[in-house]
Amino acid sequence: MKSAVETLSPTRAKLTVEVPFEELKPSLDAAYKQIAKQINVPGFRRGKVPPAIIDRQVGRGAVLDQAINDVVPQKYVEALQANSLQPLAQPEIEVTKFEDNQALEFTAEVDIRPEIALPDYDGVEAQVDDIELSDADVEEQVEALRERFATLIDVERPAAEGDFVVMDLVATRDGEPIEGAEVSGMSYRVGRGGMLDGLDEALVGMSAGDEKTFQSELVGGDMVGEAVDVAVTVSQVQEQELPELDDEFAQMASEFDTVEELTADVRERLGRGRRLEQAAAARDAVLEQLLDRVEVPLPEVVVTDELNARRQNVEQQLAYAGITMEKYLEDEGQTMEEFEADLERRVRDAVAAQFLLDEVAKKEEFGIDQAELSEHLVRRAQQSGQDPQEFANHMFEHNHIPELVQEILRGKALARIVEAAVVKDGSGNVVELKNLRPDGTIGEPEDEIEAETEIEIEPAAETDTEADTEQ
């Protein structure tokens, strides 16, 4: 077999392959055997029909077509390997020349992984915002803790913002109740929002026993987004009574003996959270700085596939939440054109980052072992609220392990870049990145996967996996 490659663009190549007729013989023999099992010829047992009889009964052309369908994919893969090409999608194959007893020629156009000239990624400089933690932030968290231990007291007065009401809701259209669009005995905090437009305004001023009708739009079901009349009936108005912020409350709500200790712990927890946020921002800023130094050609097929996947994910999340795209765009203050432009920008940045990190992983010759794969599987399972072993089984059964391997390798590459970077905050202080895990994620040391969490890994995953896994 002979092959040649023509570069059509930095992300697309054309292979021209010539296969001598002799190399088709195994596929021709296999085609004859398969056809012999499928036809009935008087005087011959099924599967024992000679090739010459098959040529007369079925036609030599049918045998050749079957052989070509068998041999072309094999020779395409051989040509990829011979020319060190990494395909990103299915090829467009065209048989350009073939006659019986003559060489087979075909071409294959395919999107390929771009070549990237890696810049020096040691000592990348980036800047992030200062950590801001005010007394008001701490007080807000302490107040939220008090609200968790609050009691509700019935009051005989009109409801005001911040009160709780027990209510019934019934949605109607043209005077007819809408199936599934009613609730009974629901406790709701006036002013909370996020339920029905107009509900909070209707509830303010209502007393126990009052009924009121207002217009709104349904946020779920088959009639989502349609205008309806909503009747609200209040059966109770309740005032929230917060516990006193004293040592007794601290002992009830926490493991601490005093309010001072409780408040100090809240401040420390908030501080850790802000430091983690800053570390994540530093990681992203370093990657952004490195991307600015390199040109990454993007295969449009990869961008398009990722765009479609993310768009579908947004649509599914909105449908699950009972929110229309129009309502979402209104809340975000975006037009559809702005949404699409922002989505495409983020997708292109993400795809460029993936290719860049793949190259770093390849240069550093990173691999992964069974323990790392197991830990990553457990973390992913915990993030999605699934049983680790069931999650691992699903990933193996559906051949998603290469994707997880690539995630780990990219994480290692990102960690390598960030660890060598110099990141400062707005005040010029060097940002500590000790909370960066080896896989590139951010977390506290105590958040690491517990050692006793074990899952069974298939033997094929036990060997080190190199960084050249395909996109």
From Swiss-Prot:
Question: Which intervals of the chain are annotated as region Disordered?
Answer: 436-471
Q: What is its main location?
A: cytoplasm
Q: What does this protein do?
A: Involved in protein export. Acts as a chaperone by maintaining the newly synthesized protein in an open conformation. Functions as a peptidyl-prolyl cis-trans isomerase.
Q: Which GO terms describe its biological process?
A: 'de novo' cotranslational protein folding; cell division; chaperone-mediated protein folding; protein transport; protein unfolding
Looking at the Swiss-Prot or TrEMBL record, what is one Pfam family this protein matches?
Trigger_N
Catalytic reaction list: [protein]-peptidylproline (omega=180) = [protein]-peptidylproline (omega=0)
- Superkingdom of the organism of origin: Bacteria
Description of its domains: Consists of 3 domains; the N-terminus binds the ribosome, the middle domain has PPIase activity, while the C-terminus has intrinsic chaperone activity on its own.
GO MF assignments: peptidyl-prolyl cis-trans isomerase activity; protein folding chaperone; ribosome binding
Tell me the protein's name.
Trigger factor
Keyword list (alphabetical) reads: Cell cycle, Cell division, Chaperone, Cytoplasm, Isomerase, Rotamase
Source organism per entry reads Nocardioides sp. (strain ATCC BAA-499 / JS614)
Family recorded in the similarity comment = Belongs to the FKBP-type PPIase family. Tig subfamily.
Kindly indicate whether the keyword Transferase belongs to this entry: no
EC number(s) per entry: 5.2.1.8
All copies of the PPIase FKBP-type domain together span 162-243
- GO terms under cellular component: cytoplasm
